[in-house]
Regions:
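Hydrophobic alpha-helical segments of polytopic membrane proteins
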Residues: 208-227, 232-296
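Hydrophobic, glycine- and aromatic-enriched re-entrant/interface helices and adjoining loop segments
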Residues: 258-367
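Short, Lys/Arg-rich, polar N-terminal cytosolic tail immediately upstream
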Residues: 2-25
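Membrane-helix boundary/helix-loop-helix interface segments in multi-pass membrane proteins
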Residues: 23-62, 69-230, 236, 415-429
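Hydrophobic alpha-helical transmembrane segments
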Residues: 61-65, 119-127, 189, 361-382
Length: 429
């Protein structure tokens, strides 16, 4: 069964499907706003059972959270938005905010949850929505493709000179502005969304060779920037986003198949080459005879080897590269349905890479599966919205599709990595 979207197929969609875009669902009710607010309040009670301190901190954040849920929910309902999607996003937000306050109490995080940053991000999202119409119009012009490239390169340059790592892993993905820590690599992901939306909406979409060339240049720019700031975690999300966007929106052709397979093969060959080089260069590294030029790429080779070898056998280095994965394994085993009751809190970076493990450890597997349900719900509804809007609002649908896929990748790669299923979590180099 074909799941990609061809331009020829778009022209053949009948009028009944087009009418579906405009007709709201029968159960697309404003009751979803009430459900979301009730969940936010109920989760505060659950937090109180775990930690009164975390619950009172959550109570302070609950006021702007409930108000924003009501306001944004009303706007979404009046604009005939998907209220089920809105409800799922609100529930995930409440879980995330409450978890951060619980982590601040139970663990020793490098950085604590900031209500100020939460309010600033909320205001920025409002400003973004206000100007999104102008941005959307600009994406139809070819110059926006190069503008997104330039913005991404500028972000990497800023991080190279001014970036630092509050966790002490040696990456340069964060900057500090008057005491507020920002991870600028998140903005490169937003640029990627706009880049692909513009690429498949402007005049270049008619030329497959041009699309592959420009997308490859953008892909290599992100790879080079990620290596420059010693941070591959965000790049892996951009890597999968790159392949998914081309698979879905580039018309099916032999050239497309060859390109995607070539990228996959090159990726696997790079990992295999890293293993070979690690075995070959390890003696010279131990003897201190490694040439200076080779020593510059040695950290990359060693990190890739460590991540894959530790995933294969977590006990190879239990007090080094495998330490946080070993602690995560213990936390998951002791979590139970309702959370850890033996006070095991030796979990590194619980506020970032190990957030899902911390959620299961403190709140139990029931909450963990609830979060996974909301994540799948958001993903399915986002993809459904894309399918409904792709004919008449192509650029908007591409942005929604990209944001949905990127949110899913961001969450699932970290979750599977922290559970030692994928060797991708914690890949600073």
């Amino acid at each position: 069964m074909k799941i990609w979207i061809d331009d020829e197929e778009e022209k053949d969609i009948d009028s009944s499907q087009e009418l579906l875009e405009e007709e709201p669902e029968e159960d697309n009710s404003d009751r979803c706003i009430v459900h979301a607010i009730f969940f936010e309040l109920a989760f505060g009670a659950v937090l109180y059972l775990k930690s009164a301190t975390a619950a009172f901190s959550y109570l302070i954040a609950l006021a702007p959270l409930v108000v924003s849920t009501g306001i944004l929910g009303s706007i979404c309902y009046k604009k005939n938005g998907d209220m089920k999607l809105f409800r799922a996003i609100c529930c995930m937000s409440a879980l995330g905010i409450g978890l951060q306050y619980l982590i601040d109490v139970k663990y020793s995080p490098v950085s604590e949850f900031s209500l100020i940053k939460f309010c600033i991000s909320f205001l920025l999202s409002i400003i973004f929505l206000i100007f999104y119409g102008m941005i959307q119009k600009g994406l139809k012009y070819a110059f926006s493709v190069y503008l997104c490239m330039g913005i991404s390169v500028s972000i990497y340059i800023v991080l190279y000179f001014f970036g630092y790592d509050p966790n002490g892993y040696g990456t340069n993905a964060w900057i500090n502005i008057h005491g507020l820590t920002l991870q600028l690599t998140d903005f490169t992901k937003v640029c990627a969304l706009f880049f692909y939306s513009s690429l498949f909406s402007c005049k270049y979409k008619e030329n497959d060779t041009k699309v592959l060339l420009l997308s490859s240049i953008f892909f290599l720019l992100n790879l080079g920037g990620s290596l420059l700031i010693h941070e591959l975690g965000s790049f892996f999300i951009l890597f999968f986003l790159h392949l998914v966007m081309l698979f879905m929106f580039l018309p099916h052709s032999f050239k497309k198949v060859v390109y995607i397979l070539s990228v996959f093969i090159a990726c696997f060959m790079s990992v295999a080459l890293s293993f070979i080089l690690y075995k070959a260069l390890l003696p010279s590294y131990q003897n201190g005879t490694m040439p200076s030029l080779i020593s510059k790429i040695w950290p990359f080779i060693r990190k890739i080897y460590e991540r894959f070898s530790i995933t294969a056998n977590i006990n190879n280095d239990p007090y080094g590269a495998g330490y946080q994965l070993l602690q995560a394994k213990k936390s998951l085993w002791m979590a139970g349905f309702f959370g850890n009751t033996v006070n095991f809190n030796s979990l590194p970076v619980a506020e970032s890479d190990m957030a899902f493990v911390a959620m299961v450890s403190q709140l139990g597997w029931i909450t963990g599966f609830m979060y996974l349900y909301f994540l799948c719900r958001v993903t399915c509804l986002g993809l459904r919205y894309t399918r409904m809007r792709i004919v008449k609002y192509r650029d908007e649908a591409i942005v929604v599709f990209g944001a949905t896929i990127m949110l899913f990748l961001q969450a699932i790669l970290v979750i599977l990595g922290s559970c030692n299923i994928l060797p991708l979590t914690g890949l600073p180099i």
